[in-house]
Curated annotation (Swiss-Prot):
2 of the reaction center chlorophylls (ChlD1 and ChlD2) are entirely coordinated by water. Herbicides such as atrazine, BNT, diuron or ioxynil bind in the Q(B) binding site and block subsequent electron transfer. Pheophytin a binds at residue 126. One of its GO terms (cellular component) is chloroplast thylakoid membrane. It comes from Aethionema grandiflorum. InterPro entries: D1/D2, Photo_II_D1/D2_sf, Photo_RC_L/M, Photo_RC_L/M_CS, PSII_D1. This is Photosystem II protein D1.
Length: 353
């Protein structure tokens, strides 16, 4: 008997790289989306940390009045932020090599644009990586779909809104107090609290929290006892066990009697789909609302909508909100504008020389 041995050609370096990138045996899955995600998120994170600690003040309004945002320039964790790119730059792409010097780049808020653009690319790739890993493992794609909600929200406040307003200086600052300032100014200029898409987002976030707490407490309260009184109930579960760890019939019966029968899910799959879909759809709507208000399609205006028989205005809560909006608007960027936009719409009378 003759044995024929064929020499296998060694796999190319590129082939081995492809197999390693797409292998689901790695401790952390990389994937083709990860090839772009890793450097972009590392860049965004590194520049954020450095700028939050040491970036010099930024001329955010383009009027030669720099605003300090870093720790070394007098801020703390609460007040510190990455200050948005200057209004003098607008929507221009502003990498370091477009500035005359690094000092000019820092003064005009170049780090903000660098961080935001790398961050958005990175989180979009993270979403793609979630889909890619699900595909490799034969799973359904809904993890990436759910993650699209926060991606859409981040894209709305960091990219779509600045595009609509004409400048990255209108983007959300990267800090705690800066986020609150963004929210207050957004309310003043766009009346977001009266926008139905924001209302749907509030229902999504608060409702999702409520449903998550209800589900977790129901499951925890209907665990199948596997331990003694002296042991933690958590010891009664073994990872990968086939049998159910809680009694869904008991949970269904409890909740059906607490509210009414049809308020309780009797299908675990439809229940968990609902738990995922409710907050995701709500945040989708909020992101869509931000994106429409970016182009000044604002919240409802019910100002002075109720009058008496003499034509006198009877104030409603809408008028109270409007008064607060005007107060917030006149206080922000107070050195950049003589009047808020709402008070400057009337043309000045022409004078004949």
């Amino acid at each position: 008997m003759t044995a024929i041995l064929e020499r296998r050609e060694s796999e190319s370096l590129w082939g081995r790289f492809c197999n390693w990138i797409t292998s689901t045996e790695n401790r952390l899955y990389i994937g083709w989306f990860g090839v772009l995600m890793i450097p972009t998120l590392l860049t965004a994170t590194s520049v954020f940390i450095i700028a939050f600690i040491a970036a010099p003040p930024v001329d955010i309004d383009g009027i030669r009045e720099p605003v300090s945002g870093s720790l070394l320039y007098g801020n703390n964790i609460i007040s510190g932020a990455i200050i948005p790119t200057s209004a003098a730059i607008g929507l221009h792409f502003y990498p370091i090599w477009e500035a005359a010097s690094v000092d000019e780049w820092l003064y005009n808020g170049g780090p903000y644009e660098l961080i935001v653009l790398h961050f958005l690319l990175g989180v979009a790739c993270y979403m793609g990586r979630e889909w890619e890993l699900s595909f490799r493992l034969g799973m359904r794609p809904w993890i990436a779909v759910a993650y699209s909600a926060p991606v859409a929200a981040a894209t709305a406040v960091f990219l779509i809104y600045p595009i609509g307003q004409g400048s990255f200086s209108d983007g959300m600052p990267l800090g705690i107090s800066g986020t609150f300032n963004f929210m207050i100014v957004f309310q003043a200029e766009h009346n977001i609290l009266m926008h139905p898409f924001h209302m749907l987002g509030v229902a999504g976030v608060f409702g999702g929290s409520l449903f998550s707490a209800m589900h977790g407490s129901l499951v925890t309260s209907s665990l199948i006892r596997e331990t003694t009184e002296n042991e933690s109930a958590n010891e009664g579960y073994r990872f990968g066990q086939e049998e159910e760890t809680y009694n869904i019939v008991a949970a269904h019966g409890y909740f059906g009697r607490l509210i009414f029968q049809y308020a309780s899910f009797n299908n675990s799959r439809s229940l968990h789909f609902f738990l995922a879909a409710w907050p995701v759809v709500g945040i989708w709507f909020t992101a869509l609302g931000i994106s429409t208000m970016a182009f000044n399609l604002n919240g409802f205006n019910f100002n002075q909508s109720v009058v008496d028989s003499q034509g006198r205005v009877i104030n409603t809560w809408a008028d109270i909100i409007n008064r607060a909006n005007l107060g917030m608007e006149v206080m922000h960027e107070r050195n950049a504008h003589n009047f808020p936009l709402d008070l400057a719409v009337v043309e000045a009378p022409s004078t004949n020389g």
